[in-house]
Structure formats: structure tokens, C-alpha cells
């Protein structure tokens, strides 16, 4: 242990010194260490330069290639997992470590096959099946979990995105999985997770299920998922926490699940005891804010021209990038720019991002496209009615004590005439395909696409605001949680043919780094959360949408 600590300390001390002509000086002191320490160091630092030579030497020292993997290589990866869990290593470093481990195994693979053929031995690692729920195309979080699990000595079977529940169960059986992990970003994924729990219960697989993604929560897991499956359903949280949960399930399943189930029982009790008091829908409508007629008057220039932009210049977006969420994605806590002065690895990641931006701009490797159409519109019975007759129903806050807001409040009431509303769809897509989704460069590109998408939305708002108070609520988010409205807007804008975006059966947008929503101008316009709604409003909304109650519950995650 003391030698390993010295090695970690040495790794942290290497600062990339430079000569007078600006060239980096290689610090090769670690090459004087023992073979085991050198292999540990290579994995911790993600350094593959000497792997072939060191592994060739290891084959002459260790009895078998299996011993090399289970010895110095896994010792290094165990340390990576520990340091990441303690917040002493960050995701960029973990990704590079995982890549180095993959390279080491690839180098040893021919010898492993020879050894296995002669002895019948195999390396046994705990197996976890990972998948993104059916209808959901967001996989970046799942890919990060996969990387972290690999660093924690798991054998990961990644089924990809939009995976049917039957396929998940079949894979768990075929691979004799120890654990199953399912992620989802959009609310319809919650109903898929509920159905998966019921299927697992029916099949009696007795394999714990870990769920994750932005749409999941400890409350939903306790109230809607856990009662459907007797053998453990846990909400994972971030990659580090998910890895910790899975390790606990392997080492101490019975007592850990008993603890989790007791906590979930408590959460269910609190949930049912503290049911929010909801106003009757008609009363919530009566309490809607009232604005004077003049507040809906907009300059004639607002919405005068529609906007269609293809292959836009990314240079226009760089200044509008919000870097703080970028660093949060990579596991750094704090705000930009202070964060790059607080963490050396954050600064390295930032420099890599800037270099990558330069590369993709020079090579025209990202496509930024946008379509915005404006419509005269009025509000009637919580619906936004466009000048072509199309109606977009909006939900209204119904919880007692809330302001009973609806986005339709910011649109001119029919009695006053009309105001102008914009509908938009936009994307920033990576033209480069066929990349290793676990590679640092790929994750960096994907995280930059996400930031540039938000920057494009910011640019759009700035270009079109005419100095007005303007909001851009996106469908599927808290003020307008119905994802199916994206289909209405895609049809109204002809977005698929104009900018090359599409929808899944659960209304997730592809490419994933895309947005769809409304542009609403009003002095009082602001973002808010609808929260819980009553059966009366839900029934009314289903009638307006001409959709079944069951389907709307799925869309809203109810």
C-alpha cells in the first residue's frame, strides 16, 4: 500500500514542465520503479506509451496472462475506482484509465486465448447489463457509468439505446448477469421502467435493478418501481454512486437490500401522508394571473421574419457557451472560470475542449441548424390557438399555494385580439460517426455538442428578442412537460426535412443534442414548474389532445 501511495503522489507531481523553447520535458522517473508499479502508474495516468514493453516483461515474470490482469492491472484499476469515488480523480482521468486498461487487455488477448485453450480457465468478473430505456436515445450518462464500472472490475454488457424490455431480460439471462442498469432522460422512460419491473417480477430473475438518468428520482423509485419488483430496485444517481451501489450489492446484498427497502418504505409513507392539496381545475383557472391588454402589445418587428439556418458558423456561438454545466458533466464542482484555477485537471480538460473546438470548426465537423416560425396566436381555455387553427394545450399549476400559472397566460386572450408566438427546433450534431462511445475524445465532442446546442438557443433568443422579455420553454421540461407536443411543432415547422431531426416513439429527439420549444414574449413571462395536477385537469387535457388517459400518464410520467 505504501508503494502505491508513493506512485499516486508521483503521478500527481508530474506537471508537464517545459524547456526554454516551449517543448514539454518528459518526467521518466516512474520508469525506474518496479514492474508492478509501472503498470499501476500507466493505468492511473492513462499512459499507454510503454504498455507493450511492460506487458511483454510481465509475461516472463507472471505465471499466466490472467495473473497479470488480476494482479497489477486490476490493482491499478481498483485504485482508479477508489480515487474517483473519493473525488480525488475526475472523469477525464477515469476515461483515459479505462482506455489504457482496454489497450492492455487487447495486447494480452492472444496470450489469454492460448492460456484458456490449454487450461480451460477464464477470468470471472461480475456482470452487469446496461441499457437505455425503449424510446429514449440519450446514452451519454450510461456510457459514463459503463466506463466507471469497467474501472471497478465489472464485465459490462451494453445493449445501447432504445432497448425493449424483453431484450434486457433476455440479455440478463443469456449472460447470467449479476445486476441490471437502465437509464432514461425523458419522462416516458419511467413507464418503461415500471413495465420492466413487472417483467422481471414475472420472470423471477432475482437480479437487482439500478435505474438512473435525469427523469428518475428516489421518490419515483420508491413509490412506482420498488413495489413492482421484490428483488431490489435502486435509484443510482451519478456514475460514482452507481458504482458504489453495485459493489455493495455484490458484497453485502441481503443486508444492503434490507436497508434500501426500509428506506423506500419510509419514503412511500411520507409520500402518501404528505399528499399535496390540489385545487379543483376550474378554481385554478379562475385564479390565473390577469394582465392588462397593453402588456400583450408587441412591436410589429417581433416575429416579422421566420428563421432558417443550416450549417451555421460555430464561431458565433463560442462566446455564448455556458461552461459551468460542461465542468459539472465532467464531475468538477464549482463555477467557471474559477473552477479552472481550483483544479489542474479541470484546466487540462478546458484546454482540451478549446483545442477540440478549434479542430471541429476548422474541419466543419459539427452541424448547427435551426428553424423558427412565428404565428399570430391567442389564448383560450388554457390553449394556445395559432392563426392556422392549430391548438397547443398547456397545463396549469393546480397545487394549493401556487400561483396557478400556465404558459398560455402569457399569450393574448381571445377577447383582446392576438399576439405573436414563435415555435422552434434546433440542433448541433456531430457529423463524425462510428466513434468509440467510451473514448475521451468522443465524450468531449458530445459534451461540446450539448453546450453548443444551448449556446445556439441563447443566440436565437438574443437575435429575435427585439429587446423584449422573452422566454424559450422547451417541450418535455417543467413548464410544458408533455413531450408529444414536439410532434405538433415538428409538423408545423417541417423540421425533419428542414434541419434533419426526428422523433422516437416516446418523443425523444434525435440527434440527442437538439431542442424544440416556443418563444413567448411578455413582460411577466418566466419559467416555472407545473408540478402535480389533478384527475380533472388531466381528463380535460386528454380531451383537448385527443389522447387516451393511459397514454398521457405515460407521457407525463404519472
Where are these regions (language model features)?
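Long, charged amphipathic helices and adjacent flexible linkers at domain junctions
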Residues: 1-41, 90-131
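Short acidic-hydrophobic, aromatic-tinged amphipathic segments that line or gate anion-handling sites
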Residues: 232-238
